[in-house]
Amino acid sequence: MENRRISITKQLLCESFISLLKQKPIDKISVTELCQAANVNRGSFYAHYADVYDLLGQIEGIVYERLCDAVRNCNYTKSDFPRINKIIETVEAERSFCDALFGKYGSKQFLDECCEINRRDITDEWRRKFPDLDDLTLNTTYTFMVKGSLGIIEEWVNNDFSQPADFISLSICDMYAAVLAKLDGMQKSVAAKK
């Protein structure tokens, strides 16, 4: 457990870093500039981070774990509203970071990693549910659903979270239900031709 002073120092550095990341790319953020913005000395920064990339990596790691916790066991159906809503609430709780993440200088690599959190579990589940559909169809559908969800979330973030979280969750669940109904129809069509 960190002591309170260390926690406050890290929080100041994280908040200042995220603020700077909204304004410029990471390779243009110096440790000196960050420390001045956070009103923290460089020695304190280096006691916790190797460089700004290390700081970003640690922030991403924390958010990634929170998203993983929210995503686990999510089956991407309309009936899975509570889990989808948990993901959306996690994004809302990480509002400042997500603002930077979806901004001009955000980490597209991090977003891609988030999209892959559940790919194997979901496509395995779909293989059992839709045994006559090929892997390309299932993987393409997964990508469509996750990237579509990400687009909805990005629009929500970029519009300053103007809609309630449960509205966004329901929109995503409705999209999933429509896509899964299409997969079900494809499954029945392929099975009927056998």
Residue ranges of model-derived segments:
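An amphipathic alpha-helix adjacent to DNA-recognition modules
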Residues: K10-I18, K22, D27-V31, Q36-N39, ...
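Amphipathic alpha-helical packing segments from all-alpha helical-bundle domains
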Residues: G106-P131, L136-G151, A181
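Basic, amphipathic alpha-helical hairpins
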Residues: S19-I26, N73-N75, E94, E125, ...
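An amphipathic alpha-helical interaction segment
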Residues: E92-A93, T143-I152, I172-A177
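C-terminal peripheral helix-coil segments that are non-catalytic and often amphipathic
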Residues: E155-K194
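N-terminal positioning helix adjacent to the helix-turn-helix/winged-helix DNA-binding module
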Residues: E2, I8-L12, S16, T137
